[in-house]
Regions:
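TPR alpha-solenoid repeat register
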Residues: 36, 70-73, 107, 141, ...
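Position-specific recognition of the canonical hydrophobic site in helix A of tetratricopeptide repeat
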Residues: 38, 45, 75, 79-82, ...
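Canonical tetratricopeptide repeat
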Residues: 39, 72-76, 110, 144, ...
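Short coil turns that delineate tetratricopeptide repeat
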Residues: 65-68, 102, 136, 170, ...
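Terminal, low-structured helical/coil segments at or just beyond the last alpha-helical repeat
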Residues: 249, 253-285
Length: 285
């Protein structure tokens, strides 16, 4: 009986020693495999071969599921998937990365902007709030949250975030534009015009600023000035079909139906469906 016990003990010890000796080797092989797939993934990214890069990063994660490197790998995987237009897959990858590193600011921002690209502002808002709870001066998070607040018509909250953003970065162009558009929404037309004029003067080749100011001028019924801005915007971006629609709408306000129809025809030629402009065409008759 004693001999049997000793034999069983020795056999168990051999197994333990075998596992103890083999485990580092297994981990080493897994790490080497992960490193191989990671290097390939980065190489494919540099070549802009995104499908191959995605597959390599997946293989890298699978090679060592418990590796600390998986935070970085899953984040890169999400970025590649996003660039491929696979937003749901990207969000899933970012979420898995957050399981390894909860409340990582960079990953939360990546997931928030992916949510916004999908139109899921509510989930983006949660991520942005988590970012700002951890890093109160995060400019990008302040901008995107202000944008969401504006869409919700929570104008006071939006203004507070824009003010915080501009206190941090007074020349933040998107922040300045966002605040001007917010003033426009709230009917502060002269203030909005002044802010947009400052942006136009600083960036005279930016068609977006010209169109935004034109919209304010139209609301103030300063049609001739608005027309100058739209003409300037079209000169900068002559293939933007929506600018021609905007000018056509202005021409209709000015009772210039022939000019309006010509701009609508131009928008159709640039790719807009004629049926989507049917109401405006009727006004040209």
């Amino acid at each position: 009986m004693l001999t049997l016990i000793i034999f069983s003990y020795l056999r168990a010890m051999k197994r333990w020693l075998f596992v103890s000796l083999m485990l580092p080797l297994v981990l080493l092989v897994a790490a080497q495999s992960q490193s191989k797939w990671t290097d390939r993934g980065y190489a494919y990214m540099e070549q802009d071969s995104l499908a191959q890069a995605e597959e390599c990063f997946k293989r890298a994660v699978e090679a060592a599921p418990t590796s600390k490197q998986n935070v970085m790998l899953l984040t890169n995987l999400g970025t590649v998937q996003r660039r491929r237009g696979k937003l749901l897959d990207a969000i899933e990858s970012y979420t898995l990365a957050l399981n390894y590193s909860p409340l990582d600011v960079a990953i939360l921002m990546s997931r928030a902007t992916a949510y916004m690209a999908l139109g899921n502002d509510d989930k983006a808002y949660i991520d942005l709030c988590n970012v700002l709870d951890k890093q109160t001066d995060h400019a990008e998070a302040l901008y995107y949250r202000a944008f969401i607040y504006t869409g919700r018509r929570e104008y006071a909250a939006a203004r507070a975030d824009y003010k915080r953003l501009l206190a941090l970065q007074p020349d933040h162009e998107n922040g300045l534009l966002g605040l001007a558009l917010l003033d426009h929404r709230e009917g502060r037309l002269q203030t909005a015009e002044l802010q947009l004029t400052a942006l136009v003067e600083r960036h005279p080749s930016n068609a977006t600023y010209l169109q935004a100011r034109a919209n304010v001028l139209i609301e103030r019924q300063l049609y001739d000035l608005a027309l100058l801005d739209l003409e300037g915007a079209i000169a900068l971006q002559p293939t933007d079909a929506y600018l021609y629609v905007a000018r056509a709408e202005l021409y209709l306000k000015m009772k210039r139906r022939t000019a309006a129809k010509s701009d609508l025809d131009r928008a159709v030629a640039l790719g807009l469906p004629r049926i989507s402009l049917s109401e405006l065409y009727k006004q040209c008759e």
